[in-house]
Amino acid sequence: MTITTNDLTELQAIAEAGAAQLGPDATAEQLLQWTAETFGSDFIIAANMQDAVLIDVADKAIEDKNAVGGKLKALFLDTGYHFAETLGTRDAVAQVYDLDLHNVTPEHTVAEQDQLVGKNLFASDAAQCCNLRKVVPLRGALAPFRAWVTGIRRVEAPTRANAPLISFDDAF
């Protein structure tokens, strides 16, 4: 069954049902198969290059690419602060896995942002910098999709230690 609703209450219920169905110990493969079966082509994998393994797992777990629109969709959030090697890895991963890569950028370049709000906003107001360079562009990029898969790791921070396998995030 492929879900075609944009109703936030219904999407939240789908997330809760999926979490109950899969349980907290489901594998990444099981989660990705459930996501493809549930959302079809209306999901995207949001991955930075530390999460490139997620692309590999999805490529192997979702054998029928027609079920997801022919290609896996992946989102790379280019904040303007990445090393050249990171961008090279992004491009190589997209080529190796034949992805529909959505390269998402903020409204302004780093230089333009420096002109508008001052240099090194990340040092003077990290929350505002994160909002401008990550949150706002991510909201726009995720708007066409009903679901997204991320590679957050529970070991990254105490706030992620109990991150559920499937959740509903009304911020996006």
Question: Could you tell me what each predicted segment is?
Answer:
Residues 2-172:
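ATP-dependent adenylation/nucleotidyltransferase module used to activate substrates
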